[in-house]
Amino acid sequence: MGIRSYKAYTPGTRNRSVSQFEEIVQSKPEKQLTSGQHRKKGRNNRGVITSRHRGGGHKRLYRHIDFKRDKYGMLGRIVSIEYDPNRNARICLISYQDGEKRYILHPRGISIGDQILSDTHAPISPGNALPLTNMPLGTTIHNIELQPGKGGQVARAAGAIAKIIAKEGKFATLRLPSGEVRLVLQQCLATIGQVGNVDANNQSIGKAGSKRWLGRRPTVRGVVMNAADHPHGGGEGRAPIGRKRPLTPWGRPTLGRKSRSRHKYSEALILRRRKNA
């Protein structure tokens, strides 16, 4: 995927860069695999904001992605590679031998006409899905299950890639994109290869309006709020936060404070925390 940079025609294009969308071959999605999407704008069932800075954005259709890859033993052919407004990764439409069509995440290097397979003993090639127990050490994978049959939950973003570094007993040891080293059951399914659109992180938004198109509202610093609205607020003029450490709007320590519960069931499966934790 290429990145297109703009010249400074306006202040908004001065540092703007976007994807060239050169791998996309179809503009309209498969109708039977889409549905309308009610955007909650960060509100819960009572209308109270539970996730700040969300709202607006362009209207979208939701594409139903096959994260389970449960068409076992049936060859599928790549029909098209499409844009998905709900994620950074591209998606590709698969047509199976029985006529069924499904969307999957687009693996890097896969092109139209290629065949993929989901099976216990599928070949080790990009796009194929099989259990971790049948993959050799050093295999690069994505769309990894954490519970057998639940569907892929890890390494699904654009450019995401994980690696099998060891196997022992019923667990495989994986190095995840975040740098975390974790144990996963060998019966869990994963897809070979790396998620496509690897340059997604190299794009520069360029202007605030681009974030609004994506449904992201402005973030206001706590230090410029009133004391009633944020622990950092108040004071005369440009004042410091007046605290020993930064706090969230609800008074909890932040910016470096670990927030993960020590009593999570999966704590014993994490051998090394992620890099920024």
UniProtKB/Swiss-Prot annotation:
CC per GO annotation: chloroplast; mitochondrial large ribosomal subunit
InterPro entries tied to this protein: NA-bd_OB-fold, Rib_uL2_dom2, Ribosomal_uL2, Ribosomal_uL2_bac/org-type, Ribosomal_uL2_C, Ribosomal_uL2_CS, Ribosomal_uL2_dom3, Ribosomal_uL2_RNA-bd_dom
Signal peptide coordinates: none
Region (Disordered): 24-57, 226-266
Swiss-Prot/TrEMBL keywords: Chloroplast, Plastid, Ribonucleoprotein, Ribosomal protein
A GO BP annotation: mitochondrial translation
Molecular-function annotations in GO: rRNA binding; structural constituent of ribosome; transferase activity
Primary site of residence: plastid
Subcellular location: Plastid, Chloroplast
Complexes and interactors: Part of the 50S ribosomal subunit.
Family according to the record: Belongs to the universal ribosomal protein uL2 family.
Cited HAMAP family: Ribosomal_uL2_B
Name recorded for this polypeptide: Large ribosomal subunit protein uL2c
Gene expressing this chain: rpl2
